[in-house]
Amino acid sequence: MIRQVIGAAALILIAAPAFANPCGFDERGRMVVTGYAVGQTTIPGDQKAKLAEFAETAKFRTGICVFAQVDKQGSDAANERVASGRAENVRQYLLSQGVKADAIRIGKQEEAFTFFGLLSSDQEDDRRVFVTHN
């Protein structure tokens, strides 16, 4: 039992940075844009309503953080391009919804990448963009 508790605590400590906000502020709200195909940077159509709803609150915030994750496929350079493209497309969408440009920050990509998934279904979950506000 003690080993299990220690193991769970260690896992939490290891995984915590992956879930931390890379823009450095306390989160008051968060949403996740999911459904990206491999290599796709365009926001999936079924996610735009959810993102627009988030933008309604985000318009009144001073800190918006956008950071993208990718799956294990592709080279580091390709994954960085895809993650940057996803984050930038979400940023542009938020701007189109009236969120102030100076409030939006793109999180550092190396802090946002987490590759927990081993199965193909897990890798689908890894292809996402987190959007948070203070």
Q: Model features per residue range: what roles?
A:
Residues 15-17:
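N-terminal signal peptide c-region/cleavage motif recognized by signal peptidases
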Residues 34-44, 71, 75-80:
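Second-shell loop/turn segments in exported
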Residues 21-26, 31-34, 38-40, 54, ...:
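Periplasmic OmpA/Pal-like peptidoglycan-binding modules at the C-termini of bacterial envelope proteins
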Residues 51, 66, 82-97, 131:
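Cysteine-centered nucleophilic/redox motifs
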Residues 44-47, 79-87, 124:
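Short, conserved glycine- and acidic-residue-centered signature motifs
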Residues 51-84, 105-114:
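Short, surface-exposed beta-strand segments enriched in small/polar/acidic residues
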Residues 1-7:
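Bacterial N-terminal signal peptides that target proteins for export
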Residues 56-63, 92-100, 134:
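Sec-exported extracytoplasmic/periplasmic mature domains
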